[in-house]
Amino acid sequence: MIRYFTAGESHGPALSAIVEGLPAGLTVTPEDINKELARRQQGYGRGGRMKIETDKADVLSGIRFGKTIGSPVTLQVENRDWKNWTVKMARFDTPAEEIPAITVPRPGHADLTGMIKYGFEDIRPVIERASARETAARVAACALAKVFLRSAGIQIGSYVSSIGAAGKTAPSPRLHELLDAGAETLAEEADASSVRMLEKEHETHAIAAIDKAKEEGDTLGGIIELFITGVPMGLGSYVQHDRRLDAELAAALISIQAVKGVEIGTAFENARKPGSQVHDALFLRKGDGPERKTNRAGGIEGSMTNGQIIHLRAAMKPIATLMSPLQSFDIRSLDAHLSHIERSDTCAVPACSVIAEAVIAPVIANALLRKTGGDHLEEILERLEAYKADIAKNFQP
């Protein structure tokens, strides 16, 4: 099973990740990882930090001659901004001058609770690890899972359907055409937009909304649409709660900073309708397996993949750091005070969509590995093809 851990602070020397459980024999290039890191850095509404960083991953272990060797892969992403923080973020040396403590928490952030939980007198340590900068390490780590899935014919893609009130959550008219070519085709089309939207009109409105929010010292969230194509039926399980695929996918998405809601298929719309208007009727194409004319379940029934495209939706709240700060208080003096201001983005929904693609990749990869088993790529792919052949036998006349 694939699992990964990340380490590092937002303004420390580097972010690190260790990825364990990748099968041996998987061909990996630096571009496979660095392309995903570059995608994460893009998007209209990002702050000044992205002008400093040029994220690239150094591979320190687990790959030899361009192939995984079955041992843990260690990745490191340099923080170029570290040179500006060597005093404030010194690891051992006590600074000669006093570093002012941050004592006014930001509403909506980890500041207040993190400070109390870990016994800090300064919010800085909370800011450093709670920061979404950590997701650079996650994107690098999960890029390897995306490579593995791609080798199995499984693709992940996303686009942004709304930012603030701009855009629509109704499916784009071009969606089916793009997904027919695979979810990565959809992602490439979205990448051509500075806000990762598919409709030019929506993009224009979103950019205007971001500009207005920035001018007012405010921030914007949005909704991300995710799709996974090429997934065979039968991944996941209804047998135990921790093997339910929809639960694992939802947990992965909610783990992203500022993501506060997840939808599978058209779940919230379904909740307002009778079952006869919700469940996807089954038809049999003789010799070619089951067919559904709708996909309101989002490709998952009974917590297992049903052979359709997986559709997920994630809601990202507006970023908690406001240039026109909300009311707060000083944790030391307990006096009322406007909340702390930290360098931040106005809108990071496009970046979040790339992160969302990343974090669901190990979930699908592990569901596949639980089905096939295997320690090297060749045997896994052989078993996958055999499994697909077994599925097809059920629908032969």
UniProtKB/Swiss-Prot annotation:
Positions contributing to NADP(+) binding: R40, R46
Enzyme class: lyase
Pathway: Metabolic intermediate biosynthesis; chorismate biosynthesis; chorismate from D-erythrose 4-phosphate and phosphoenolpyruvate: step 7/7
Family: Belongs to the chorismate synthase family.
Function recorded in the entry: This reaction introduces a second double bond into the aromatic ring system.
Subunit and interaction comment: Homotetramer.
Chain residues that bind FMN: R129, A130, S131, Q257, A258, G302, K317, P318, I319, A320, T321, R343
Pfam families linked: Chorismate_synt
Keyword Thylakoid: no
Keywords (A to Z) from UniProt: Amino-acid biosynthesis, Aromatic amino acid biosynthesis, FAD, Flavoprotein, FMN, Lyase, NADP
GO molecular function terms listed in the Swiss-Prot or TrEMBL record: chorismate synthase activity; FMN binding
Reported cofactor(s): FMNH2
One Gene Ontology cellular component: cytosol
Cofactor note: Reduced FMN (FMNH(2)).
Catalytic activity: 5-O-(1-carboxyvinyl)-3-phosphoshikimate = chorismate + phosphate
Organism: Chlorobium phaeobacteroides (strain BS1)
Gene that this sequence comes from: aroC
Family matches, as HAMAP family: Chorismate_synth
Residue runs in coiled coils: none
Transcription among keywords: no
One GO-annotated biological process of the protein: amino acid biosynthetic process
Full protein name: Chorismate synthase
Record-listed E.C. numbers: 4.2.3.5
